[in-house]
């Protein structure tokens, strides 16, 4: 199976071209065709020799993903189901924000973190995505607009889709550097957010990388007992270890950390828990931000329900009174398979049911 050309960084592209006996500027031409002109085949690279195009075709594909399903919401949110070369499925989501077009990318097929409220974890991790497969998600979303003649550009990226980004650390870091490259998509570092469920050692590594992207941490509870019951990962990285890493990150980068907090009715959304969260954040209050997330119900996790608006606002008001910067996240795509992993999970379920019907037919 040939790799995607998107899997190469610009420096790797230069090294590849030189290994083929080509001049360095040929790599710059290929890079421009891919990321500025956004062609979908090597044959469209009209200033390259036939010999070089043949080498590219022999060694790479452009985009390895196949579009299976597109769902468009009334609010402009677009959810994509892509098929990988090995037949596995991933999701990507485009969200229209007041500040631009934001794309949420997937980094793994399935997830091993085991959050008890999440559709992504219903299917265990099967493999990591490589850099090319992650970049391809952005390029296909951009193609969606290019083909419609819409003069719109992906401006923001959130690495919050299926999987734990820091469990696929090297490929995610390579992806960030690829899309941030000023000769390519040139998406600003401060327009890129990487999320983690709390791999403390990787947060420390990330602090030392020198990338100026945003960090978000899925917290979802203010104490160990509750967090462990919601997120299995807390057994390995309890709050004390997690916050030591977060404080190291803030001291090293002087960058703000966003805390994601999903609102589960009568589970983690009480006023006392809001006070506990404010106390937890008191030492990093100036460089922290809490994102309160309305819960999208998942049928397989029917022990949870969405917090009523009055409980959400009481939680929000308590944080505010205690000096915590916070916001209630705007919802997107509520009329489609909105929860992370839901479209993929539902599609796989339908595919299995279809296969069973076909197998029993005479």
From Swiss-Prot:
Q: Is the Coiled coil keyword given for this protein?
A: no
The positions annotated for binding S-adenosyl-L-methionine are 163-164, 195, 218-220, 296
Entry keyword set: 4Fe-4S, Cytoplasm, Disulfide bond, Iron, Iron-sulfur, Metal-binding, Methyltransferase, rRNA processing, S-adenosyl-L-methionine, Transferase, tRNA processing
* Major subcellular site: cytoplasm
PANTHER family, alphabetized: 23S RRNA METHYLTRANSFERASE, RADICAL SAM CORE DOMAIN-CONTAINING PROTEIN
Q: This protein is called what?
A: Probable dual-specificity RNA methyltransferase RlmN
Boundaries of every Radical SAM core domain copy:
97-329
| Active site residues according to the UniProt entry | 91 (proton acceptor), 340 (s-methylcysteine intermediate)
Q: Which organism is it from?
A: Streptococcus gordonii (strain Challis / ATCC 35105 / BCRC 15272 / CH1 / DL1 / V288)
UniProt family annotation: Belongs to the radical SAM superfamily. RlmN family.
Give the binding site residues for [4Fe-4S] cluster. 111, 115, 118
According to the UniProt entry, the coiled-coil residues are none
Q: Which InterPro entries match?
A: Aldolase_TIM, Methyltransferase_A, RlmN_N, RNA_MTrfase_RlmN, rRNA_lsu_MTrfase_RlmN/Cfr, rSAM
A GO molecular-function descriptor: tRNA binding
Query: What Pfam families does this protein's entry cite?
Result: Radical_SAM, RlmN_N
Q: In the record, what lineage is assigned to the organism producing the protein?
A: Bacteria, Bacillati, Bacillota, Bacilli, Lactobacillales
Q: Which cofactor does it need?
A: [4Fe-4S] cluster
EC annotation from Swiss-Prot or TrEMBL:
2.1.1.192
Cystine bridges: 104-340
């Amino acid at each position: 199976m040939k790799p995607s050309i998107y899997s190469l960084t610009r420096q790797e592209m230069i090294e590849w071209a030189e290994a083929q006996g080509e001049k360095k500027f040929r790599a710059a031409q290929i890079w421009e065709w891919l990321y500025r002109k956004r062609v979908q085949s090597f044959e469209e690279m009209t200033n390259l020799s036939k010999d070089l195009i043949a080498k590219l075709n022999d060694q790479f594909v452009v985009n390895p993903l196949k579009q299976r399903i597109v769902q468009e919401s009334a609010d402009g949110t677009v959810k994509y189901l892509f098929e990988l070369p090995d037949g596995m499925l991933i999701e990507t989501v485009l969200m229209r924000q007041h500040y631009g077009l934001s794309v949420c990318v997937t980094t793994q097929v399935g997830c091993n973190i085991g959050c008890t409220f999440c559709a992504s974890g219903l299917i265990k991790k099967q493999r990591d995505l490589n850099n090319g497969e992650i970049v391809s998600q952005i390029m296909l979303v951009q193609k969606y607009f290019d083909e419609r003649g819409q003069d719109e550009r992906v401006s923001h990226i959130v690495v919050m889709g299926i999987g734990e980004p820091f469990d696929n650390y090297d490929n995610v870091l390579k992806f960030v550097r690829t899309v941030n490259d000023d000769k390519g998509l040139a998406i600003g570092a401060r327009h890129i957010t990487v999320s983690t469920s709390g791999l403390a050692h990787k947060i420390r590594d990330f602090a030392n990388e020198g990338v100026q992207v945003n960090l978000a941490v899925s917290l979802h509870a203010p104490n160990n007992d509750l967090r462990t019951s919601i997120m299995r990962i807390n057994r390995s990285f309890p709050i004390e270890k997690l916050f030591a890493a977060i404080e190291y990150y803030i001291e090293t980068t002087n960058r703000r950390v966003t805390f994601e907090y999903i609102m589960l009715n009568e589970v983690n959304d009480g006023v006392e828990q809001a006070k506990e969260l404010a106390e937890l954040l008191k030492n990093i209050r100036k460089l922290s931000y809490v994102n309160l997330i309305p819960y999208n119900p998942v049928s397989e996790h029917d022990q949870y329900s969405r917090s009523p608006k009055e409980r959400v606002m009481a939680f929000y008001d308590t944080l505010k009174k205690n000096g915590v910067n916070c916001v209630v996240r705007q919802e997107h795509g509520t009329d489609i398979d909105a929860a992370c992993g839901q479209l993929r999970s539902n599609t796989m379920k339908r595919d299995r049911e279809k296969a069973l019907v076909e197998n029993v037919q005479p």
